[in-house]
């Protein structure tokens, strides 16, 4: 029986009163309260605290505020697509303490891996007798997303059952351990990384890979994609936006005070992860959970940590903005006005500041070794004295300062910030130093994304490499604390949006698909990144697999057609006639009448132009498209609703098309093996992370003569030398001996070929050769 525990509720109320009435500064007070906000299992009771300033603002009497507990009459199956479940409802009176509402309750079931817990939300009654709800943004489990009641969950029991205890014990120190950077990183979007598209399926992949690595078995190309990395960085795994026009995943029919029936839909949105609503940031997006249980993120962390050579987990967190949908689930105090992504967060509000830092702490406690902060340049606040926005670097430092507790080990994770300030200022590409956070924080191992890693890099345009030479010099001199590499979720997406009329490097391939694939999985670029550049290299698995990628978000109703119009050009870069013709490709669009690629291309040629000239008037766009002669293929009649259906079909079909598992058959065994060897080469030489020293050399061959040829000579602390030569773009070099180039320190004997790109035969051990675009070599020499 669910009932209020009077003694525990009084103690909780007294603690809140004492804490709020203390003499500490406001933010320090909120930091003390934040770890207890939400619903927690305490001695078989549920302790529940909600931050509810809106109830004070609307002068809601304390007697009209309740915790609404929803106990399912039958156990929901979280693996079912849809079901109707009847819930028994219990109203428990809550206490008001300033702008908090709290209560302690007996009888609520705590969810576990094997049991569904009691669902809950705050309910309050207005003067007219109508009921309103406040959801828990600090929830531990959200099986139906951030816009539905939360599930009461035994999170301490979940964390206590982790299977990577030895990993954490080995890293325990007397005081707080500070984790450092990995040697290299693989970036993964969970929904497109495996056929299953869940954390559970990704965990299974790593567990199978671990078994083969431990046994010394030969790896398949699809397995080598994931091998040789020191760390895995997941694109954000927080709950994202929902369908703007519905349906909701939790739709209820009220039967009175005691029960309600809920039409439950398993969350099935597609999103690249960055469209967050802040609510639920401490837990996991249910779309990514095969079982619907947050334990899957814990299992994944354990699979990485238990790998034969343990891998680190890096979580990508988004606290720099909220999608506008966030205003539907959080009170107005959380926000500081609109921005280009949706809403600015109210970082200067002590409670908001404390709660967001607490969300971060909870998420990292799943067992992350590192944290990547998205869009750090967006953490700003309005300074009325100067009437300007200021960067909240104190908040960024607070993020780095959080001490985590995992399996008895106290530690501070490694941090990397994506910060391109003064972006989006017009001259940001010239003005950004990519060092603002590095130079402003206390820790010497804080990282940022480097200049070739930030979004707007397109290495398949002719002249790219020499046009970036000044940035390359910065990488060589200052790049030890930068993430390096040209292939990530942002750069690959930008590549798919490049105007096809620009001067592209046609030597990369015979078709646009080949050019794009080889631009972001390029042997020469990989050689430069892994065998020459300082910093920490990062690869995006969709690029390494030569799979597709784009802006994936199927929740929009109002602007969905506009988003697809902006993405339409990617059809020319990522989909050819053969790929489109495959039975598993674009089934929704084919069913709507776009039976072949040409019919879709023709439609997408008109759509972006009409979006622009009509100022996105969907009624006019539909009318004009209907009047095209000869008629366009697609649904008839072509209404606004049909346009939105096409946009939704595009997003869902592209999401499936981007799945890495669908591209396994096209993998080149020689290329995946070369990349794997190169990663292991870097892991065996962690000193390459350091900036170039006085004896090191990096340059391009002069005169250029139509060929950009990069050379690098690095010196290890133990005396080993690493020499690299890479053909970045242009014509054939003509025959030459790389070891006879006029580079100081290259003289003498003892050089051995360590790595060669696939086009160079394995029988090549030295001497003259001719290099073509994307070819290269690595030599090593040990001191005699």
Residue ranges and their predicted role:
Residues 189-203, 275-294, 338-354, 376-393, ...:
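The substrate-binding groove and active-site-proximal loops of carbohydrate-active enzymes
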Residues 133-136, 197-200, 243-247, 324-328, ...:
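Short, solvent-exposed loop/turn and secondary-structure capping segments
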Residues 205-241, 254-274, 365-366, 370, ...:
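Catalytic domains of carbohydrate-active enzymes, especially glycoside hydrolases
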Residues 184-188, 232-234, 313-317, 371-373, ...:
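Hydrophobic faces of well-ordered beta-strands that scaffold small-molecule active sites
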Residues 407-591, 599:
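Conserved alpha/beta catalytic core and glycan-binding cleft of carbohydrate-active enzymes
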Residues 244-295, 302, 323-351, 358-359, ...:
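Aromatic- and acidic-residue-enriched carbohydrate-binding clefts of CAZyme catalytic domains
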Residues 1-186, 199-214, 230, 516-527, ...:
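Carbohydrate-interacting/catalytic domains
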Residues 305, 322-433, 491:
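Active-site neighborhood of glycoside hydrolase catalytic domains
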């Amino acid at each position: 029986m669910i009932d209020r525990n009077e003694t525990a509720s009084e103690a909780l109320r007294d603690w809140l009163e004492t804490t709020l009435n203390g003499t500490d500064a406001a933010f320090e007070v909120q930091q003390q309260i934040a770890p207890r906000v939400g619903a927690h299992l305490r001695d078989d009771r549920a302790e529940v605290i909600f931050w509810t300033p809106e109830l004070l603002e609307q002068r809601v009497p304390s007697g009209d505020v309740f915790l609404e507990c929803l106990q399912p009459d039958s156990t929901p199956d979280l693996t079912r697509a849809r079901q109707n479940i009847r819930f028994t409802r219990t109203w428990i009176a809550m206490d008001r303490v300033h702008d908090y509402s709290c209560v302690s309750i007996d009888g609520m079931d705590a969810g576990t891996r094997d049991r569904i817990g009691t669902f809950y939300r705050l309910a309050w009654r207005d003067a007219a007798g109508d009921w309103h709800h406040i959801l828990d943004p600090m929830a531990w489990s959200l099986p139906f997303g951030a816009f539905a009641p939360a599930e009461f969950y035994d999170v301490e029991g979940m964390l206590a059952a982790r299977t990577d205890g030895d990993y954490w014990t080995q890293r325990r120190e007397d005081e707080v351990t500070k984790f450092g950077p990995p040697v290299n990183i693989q970036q993964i979007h969970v929904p497109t990384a495996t056929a299953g598209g869940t954390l559970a399926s990704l965990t299974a992949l790593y567990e199978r890979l671990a078994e083969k690595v431990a046994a010394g078995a030969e790896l398949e190309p699809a397995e080598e994609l994931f091998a040789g990395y020191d760390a895995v960085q997941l694109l954000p795994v927080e709950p994202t936006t929902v369908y703007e026009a519905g349906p909701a995943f939790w739709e209820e029919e009220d039967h009175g005070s005691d029960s309600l029936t809920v039409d439950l839909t398993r969350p099935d949105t597609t999103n690249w992860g960055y469209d967050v609503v802040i609510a639920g940031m401490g837990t996991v997006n249910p779309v990514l959970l095969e079982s619907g249980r947050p334990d899957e993120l814990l299992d994944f962390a354990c699979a990485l940590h238990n790998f034969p050579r343990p891998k680190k987990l890096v979580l990508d967190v988004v606290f720099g903005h909220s999608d506008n949908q966030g205003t539907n689930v959080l009170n107005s105090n959380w926000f500081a006005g609109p921005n280009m992504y949706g809403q600015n967060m109210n970082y200067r509000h002590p409670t908001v500041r404390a709660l967001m830092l607490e969300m971060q702490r909870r998420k990292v406690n799943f067992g992350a070794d590192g944290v990547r902060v998205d869009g750090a340049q967006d953490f700003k606040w309005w300074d009325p004295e100067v009437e300007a926005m200021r960067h909240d670097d104190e908040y960024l430092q607070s993020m780095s300062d959080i001490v985590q507790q995992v399996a008895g080990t106290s530690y501070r994770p490694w941090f990397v910030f994506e910060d391109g300030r003064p972006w989006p200022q017009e001259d940001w590409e010239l003005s950004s130093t990519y060092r603002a956070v590095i130079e402003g924080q206390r820790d010497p191992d804080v990282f940022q994304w480097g200049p070739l890693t930030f979004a707007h890099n397109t290495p398949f345009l002719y002249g790219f490499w020499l046009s970036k030479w000044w940035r390359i010099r910065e990488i060589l001199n200052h790049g030890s604390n930068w993430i390096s590499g040209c292939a990530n979720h942002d750069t690959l997406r930008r590549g798919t949006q490049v105007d096809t009329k620009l001067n592209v490097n046609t030597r990369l391939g015979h078709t646009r698909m080949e050019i794009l694939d080889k631009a972001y999985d390029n042997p020469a670029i990989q050689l430069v990144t892994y065998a020459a550049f300082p910093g920490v290299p990062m690869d995006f698995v969709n690029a390494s697999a030569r799979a597709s990628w784009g802006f994936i978000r199927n929740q929009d109703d109002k602007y969905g057609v506009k988003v697809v119009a902006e993405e339409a050009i990617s059809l020319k870069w990522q989909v050819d006639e053969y790929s489109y013709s495959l039975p598993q490709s674009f089934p929704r669009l084919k069913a709507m009448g776009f039976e072949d690629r040409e019919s879709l291309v023709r439609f997408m040629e008109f759509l972006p132009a009409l979006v622009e000239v009509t100022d996105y008037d969907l009624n006019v766009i539909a009318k004009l498209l209907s009047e095209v002669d000869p008629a366009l293929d697609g649904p008839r009649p072509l209404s606004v609703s049909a346009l939105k259906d096409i946009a939704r079909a595009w997003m869902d079909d592209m999401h499936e098309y981007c799945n890495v598992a669908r591209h396994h058959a096209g993998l080149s065994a020689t290329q995946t093996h070369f990349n794997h060897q190169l990663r292991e080469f870097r892991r065996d030489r962690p000193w390459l992370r350091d900036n170039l020293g006085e004896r090191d050399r990096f340059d391009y061959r002069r005169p250029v003569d139509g060929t950009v040829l990069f050379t690098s000579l690095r010196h290890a602390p133990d005396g080993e030398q690493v020499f690299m030569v890479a053909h970045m773009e242009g014509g054939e070099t003509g025959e030459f001996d790389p070891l006879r180039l006029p580079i100081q320190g290259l003289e003498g004997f003892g050089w051995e070929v360590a790595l060669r790109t696939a086009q160079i035969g394995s029988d090549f051990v030295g001497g003259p050769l001719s290099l073509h675009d994307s070819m290269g070599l690595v030599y090593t020499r040990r001191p005699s």
